[in-house]
Design a protein with these regions (language model features):
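Residues at the starts of beta-strands that form the adenosine-phosphate
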Residues: 2, 35, 126-128, 160
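Hydrophobic residues at beta-strand termini and immediately following loops
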Residues: 39, 131, 164
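Glycine-rich phosphate/pyrophosphate-binding loop and the adjoining helix
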Residues: 26, 139-190
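Short histidine/acidic/glycine/proline-rich micro-motifs that form metal-
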Residues: 10-14, 135-139, 170-171
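N-terminal beta1-alpha1-beta2 submodule of the flavodoxin-like/Rossmannoid cofactor-binding fold
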Residues: 1-103, 107, 185-190
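Short, glycine-/small-residue-rich phosphate/pyrophosphate-handling segment
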Residues: 114-156
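Structured loop/turn residues at beta-strand edges in well-structured enzyme cores
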Residues: 78, 96, 123, 156-159
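Conserved nucleotide-sugar donor-interacting segment of glycosyltransferase catalytic cores
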Residues: 105-117
Length: 190
């Protein structure tokens, strides 16, 4: 079984989201062993689409040449059995690196198709887990990042999504370690 870990965390040495995500993956591994592939988006330096790169990609799409390297992230995402995305709550959603990554995996013909009956997802994953931390005491429902990822997952054919979060970490007097432990404990019971 292949687990794809999309790591959109920055300041990785001190990232609370990354700490929580590593704990979540460890708990998953205890239940079912996975071959984990981690993509550190900050290191990948994926460029946003431009007129030139989009036109080149669309030309390949029209020819059905999905084996080209430009689609490697999309194929990797499609072929994963389980997906974990770790992204801190920034500007009501997630870091720009994750948005750029999504632009590179959102490919008609690789991760989904449009038919006369609507979209059909092509991804193998049975579940996508979104891991995040928030400084404020906001609920998952207020996290536009998770909501966006959940909608995309359904489009790609991934019916089960979950958000594992720790909130209120920057509230004055918050016990950050306790909040992270509580989130991990709650995730372990799922």
């Amino acid at each position: 079984m292949k687990l794809l870990f999309v790591n959109a965390c920055v300041n990785r040495a001190t990232s609370r989201t990354l700490k929580l995500a590593r704990g979540v993956i460890e708990a998953m591994q205890a239940q079912e062993p996975f071959e984990v592939t981690e993509i550190v988006l900050e290191e990948e330096k994926i460029a946003p689409l431009t007129t030139e790169s989009l036109n080149a990609r669309q030309a390949l799409e029209q020819k059905g040449e999905f084996d080209d390297g430009v689609f490697s992230y999309a194929r990797q995402f499609r072929d994963a059995d389980r997906i974990v995305i770790a992204a801190p709550f920034w500007a009501s959603s997630y870091p720009a690196s994750l948005k750029t990554y999504i632009e590179h995996i959102d490919i008609v013909g690789v991760n989904y198709l449009f038919t006369e009956h609507g979209p059909v997802g092509l991804c193998k994953a049975d579940k996508l887990t979104y891991v995040t931390t928030r400084g404020g005491a906001l609920p998952d429902e207020a996290d536009c990042g998770y909501q966006n990822i959940a909608v995309l997952a359904r489009l790609y054919g991934i019916e089960k999504t979950e958000c594992i979060s720790a909130a209120g970490l920057d509230v004055i007097g918050a016990n950050v370690d306790a909040l992270l432990s509580e989130a991990l404990e709650k995730a372990s019971r799922k």
